[in-house]
Every structure is written in structure tokens, then in C-alpha cells.
């Protein structure tokens, strides 16, 4: 069973995580409370830690499930030759997990960032199972062919130095916590939680692969998948 690093404040994440084997890899998730399921789907470069307060607030009245995508959080972080790191595979992983743990009816979806394309991809394949959907800062729509990347993402994605900064210095995680929190600085203990699963070159693989998997032209491997999600919404 994966566990939190010892240096983290356990009171901020007071849950007993669970693991389901999906496609030969261990997928970590939280499963708290009883009732109709609320499925919380994170994006890049976060993990179920992002939803820790929602889990606490919702669990008295709902079954709350917060997943860690493969390569993220406390889930396995396989090499590229063992896992494709594509949108299609992540949608399939989420569907498989929910089937195996019996969360298949009256689902309330909460999706953020890359979790939007993944969660909406899963929800739209079985719309009769969805009760409501909460969408935060995301997109599940195909971009016009040959859309230009924001300069910083283009740089991360297409230059060797960009990849080095993501996987070597964890700049994507660290930068996100600065850019994404304007009113006040994130407390040190909370920052430590966001960074904890991504403490090495190998553990940051999925962060870069998410950036690389954004489809900006019809030749990209995830282009068709994203258009299929859009068509079902």
C-alpha cells in the first residue's frame, strides 16, 4: 500500500488510501463515506491531495472517490515502455477503476485541468450514470488544427531544456503553485504535500507527458480521442 512520506503533516490528509490494479499498474485512490458517489478527478501537476478538503466536507453525506492518475500522486509511475501516457488510456483507466470498485450509478463528477478531458471522457461514454458535473478550469474540446501553444508550454514541450526543468528541477509543479495562488502564499505544509510525490526525475515523468499529450494538430495521437469526447458532450 503506498503511503504518505513521513515528513508530511498527516492531519492535512487523514485518509487511508486504497489501491486497485488497473492495466498491470497500481492506481491509488481515496474512498471515503457512503451514498451516491462523487468522483474527483485531478489534472497536471497535482494529485488527490488537491481535493483533501472536499473529501472531508463531502464524505459525511456522499461516497467520495479521489483518484491519482497513473504516474501521479501515490499511484505507480511506470516507464514509457510500460505505459502509454495518453488521454485514451487515462479515460480507460478511470472507467476500469470505477467499475471495479462499484461506483457506477448516480455519479457526481468534479473535474479540473487535464482531469476535465479524462473525467468528461469517462462520463460521456456512460451518460446515464452521471447525476451532475462540476467543471473547473478545463477543456474537453478539440482545438483548431495547428493551434499555437502558449509560449511557456511550447518551450516546456519542444525544447530539451524545458524537459530538463520539468523533470530535473520540478519547475512545473513549483511554478504552478506560484501562478495559481495569487491572494496569499500557499502554506509550506500544503506546498510540501503537492510536491511530495514528485521528488525525483523518474517520478516527474507524467508531468512532462501530460504537457506532451496536449493535441494541437490532427496528427497528434490524442487528437481523435479529444474530438470524440467533444462530440459526446
Predicted regions and their residues:
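Intrinsically disordered/low-complexity terminal segments and short unstructured peptides
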Residues: 1-2, 45
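Flexible "cap/lid" subdomain of the alpha/beta-hydrolase fold that forms the substrate-access gate
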Residues: 2-19, 25-27, 37, 50, ...
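A short, Lys/Arg-enriched amphipathic alpha-helix followed by its capping loop at the start of a domain
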Residues: 53-62, 100
